[in-house]
Amino acid sequence: SSTSASFAHPYMAAYAASKGGIQAMTHALAAEYSKQGIRFTAVAPGSISSGMTDASGTSKENVGPGLPDDANYEVMMKLLPAIGEGFAGPETVAGVVAMLGSVDGAFITGTEIRIDGGTHM
């Protein structure tokens, strides 16, 4: 899923609707299959340092045209409420998914886990 399912971003209505559908499906499937011990949990990353953020111009390596080096990145960092420096990487999301599949995630189902550094508190 994505944090876009729960928070409005301009020009992303179709994307947000698709992610909202994943959220609703996660809840419904968890209710349907809980008696069989099957768990469903949506993982909703915020801005993650990846090819998608690189293409959007918000990563440190790919700043927007006409701005001084690191300008877009610095603006984005000011919008984050401060867990760490910069965006999480794909390995952070992978760690959460691994936890969900382990005994540590045994009581997590029918919900969404946001990985957004506190952006959407």
Where are these regions (language model features)?
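Active-site "substrate specificity/gating" loop of NAD(P)-dependent dehydrogenases
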Residues: 8-12, 34-35
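Active-site helix of classical SDR
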Residues: 18, 26
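Short, flexible catalytic-loop segment of classical short-chain dehydrogenase/reductase
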Residues: 45-55, 59, 64
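Catalytic Tyr-x(3-8)-Lys segment
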Residues: 61-92
